């Protein structure tokens, strides 16, 4: 049985955020998971934070990509405003270390669970908004997005590299890529899969992910960039 772990001091989190709560109870509420069975938890603040994040991420993308169409902006936002995207932002704050969770969740690696981290991040943003202002929350969100999505662009966030790669290999080699599972490791709640991608028996890429689908997409992205570059060089040679 795992030992109970005491959360880090909330004041350390405030220092990271650059924001000090006037109402410390509000901060504790944002950091308390429902599994604790206390009189308060972060579900209501999560509801509020979800709406705030949807607005501010949308505004951030609207300003960052002035030429992007509505459909492109919607896809970009959908790639950030989701459980995985919020987990990434939560991890950049080491938010899991500050959470109050039950012993059962502690035993099940709850501090690293995507759902718990994502919900807590939404709750934290909701709490800051409730106590301060939308403008103040905006500065925090913008900083987090700039830090975590340095190379954010219209292609890298939502391009389906598997489909794009398949189009190239069919045109060049007359066949689709082969994805082979090389290894599978880790406990059930935190699996890691390594996938090798080959075309006509030649390996072009290997990548790992928390799911086979993620590992396939990562390996497809690597192979796509290699073959796309090769395709362009061949095309330019043909023009000479």
UniProtKB/Swiss-Prot annotation:
SUPFAM superfamilies listed in its UniProt record: dsRNA-binding domain-like, RNase III domain-like
Any one cellular-component term (Gene Ontology): cytoplasm
Record-annotated DRBM domain positions: 160-229
Active site residues of this protein: 50, 122
Enzyme class: hydrolase
Broad class of where this protein is predominantly found: cytoplasm
Catalytic activity entry: Endonucleolytic cleavage to 5'-phosphomonoester
Cofactor(s) this protein requires: Mg(2+)
Keyword annotations: Cytoplasm, Endonuclease, Hydrolase, Magnesium, Metal-binding, mRNA processing, Nuclease, RNA-binding, rRNA processing, rRNA-binding, tRNA processing
Chain ranges of the RNase III domain: 10-133
Binding site for Mg(2+): 46, 119, 122
Entries under CDD domains matching the protein: DSRM_RNAse_III_family, RIBOc
Known EC number: 3.1.26.3
Similarity annotation: Belongs to the ribonuclease III family.
Protein's UniProt name: Ribonuclease 3
Organism: Helicobacter hepaticus (strain ATCC 51449 / 3B1)
Gene from which this protein is expressed: rnc
């Amino acid at each position: 049985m795992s030992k109970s772990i005491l959360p880090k001091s909330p004041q350390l989190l405030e220092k990271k955020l650059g924001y000090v709560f006037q109402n410390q109870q509000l901060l504790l509420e944002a950091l308390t998971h429902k599994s604790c069975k206390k009189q308060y938890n972060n579900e209501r603040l999560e509801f509020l934070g979800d709406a705030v994040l949807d607005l501010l991420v949308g505004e951030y993308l609207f300003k960052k990509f002035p030429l992007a169409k509505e459909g492109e902006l919607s896809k970009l936002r959908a790639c950030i405003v989701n459980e995985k995207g919020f987990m990434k932002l939560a991890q950049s704050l080491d938010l899991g270390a500050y959470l109050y969770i039950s012993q059962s969740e502690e035993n099940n690696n709850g501090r690293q669970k995507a759902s718990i981290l994502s919900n807590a991040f939404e709750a934290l943003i909701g709490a800051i908004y409730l106590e301060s202002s939308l403008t103040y929350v905006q500065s925090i969100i913008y900083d987090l997005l700039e830090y975590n999505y340095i190379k954010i662009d219209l292609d890298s966030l939502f391009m389906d590299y598997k489909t794009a790669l398949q189009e190239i290999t069919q045109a060049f080699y007359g066949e689709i890529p082969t994805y082979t599972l090389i290894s599978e490791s880790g406990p059930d709640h935190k699996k890691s899969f390594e996938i090798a991608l080959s075309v006509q028996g030649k390996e072009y890429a290997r990548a790992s992910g928390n799911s086979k689908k993620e590992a396939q997409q990562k390996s497809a992205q690597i192979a796509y960039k290699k073959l796309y570059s090769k395709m362009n060089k061949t095309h330019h040679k043909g023009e000479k």
